[in-house]
Amino acid sequence: PYTTLFRSYYFCRNSTRRFFAREGMVCVAGSWIAISFFGCLPFVFSREIPNFVDALFEIVSGFTTTGSSILGDVEALSPGIMYWRSFSHWLGGMGVLVFLLALSPNGERGKGYTMHLLRAESPGPNVNKLVPKMRTTARILYVIYMVLTFINFLFLLLGKMPVFDAVCTAFGTAGTGGFGIRNDSIAGYSPYIQNVCTVFMFLFGINFSCYYLLLVRHVKEVLKDQELRLYIIIFVVSILLITFNVRGLYGSWEETIRHAAFQVSSIMTTTGFASTDFDLWPGFSKALLLCLMVVGACAGSTAGGLKMGRLLLI
């Protein structure tokens, strides 16, 4: 499926004329259509999802990290298809073209094409250069993305999660998409696994530029980041409000806080994992979760929603 993407990408790359923002938008839109079309073919050819429209819906949901599904029984899928379904989240989380930019060799043909492709593809209101070259910025972003995913995977393994489950869950967490490999999502796993997912969903909702600043020891800049502060404040306050609102539904404070924190982290980052049936929660908690879903997490993260940066502007 990547043949078309690479051809269209290098066609743009080797062009000698100036590359403007609108061309970047067209390349990104065309690439998303192409990869969605080819990405659904494994579902169709394997007969796991024989209907083309259903298969297209499923893979588009994966690449866009939406998380909606037409499947009634996820556990009936073969391991290979289950892996591809989860991997689509990981690819789509940071953006397929950002991935291609990160892999591409250096070169400066087609003035401005790298900058416009990265800005058109990256999540959030804007994307800033971490280093002078935009392609190097793309590589830094993806290295951070891969390292966080791997650390997430290791922590899941420490909780005695099966390797295959840990890989697929790490993909869904990193892309903040929420495709699970169990019908009950994360509810069937141990409290430790749920807590790990809570932490990493929150971490993937932070602007990736903050991680780079931490790596280069610009800690003060991270601490002064208004968007990050707002994200943490809303996250903590929401957990407290929901904890006290649903405290009578669970047997202990630990269980109450765990489910409240998990669902706030999941919904706020638009991941969509579930540790409990929150449809049974009081109206206040469900309304708060709905608001968190709309607001989303930080710009420059893999999360969806309006984004904290835009909320600050409003």
What are these regions (language model features)?
Residues 1-314:
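Membrane-proximal intracellular helices of multi-pass ion channels
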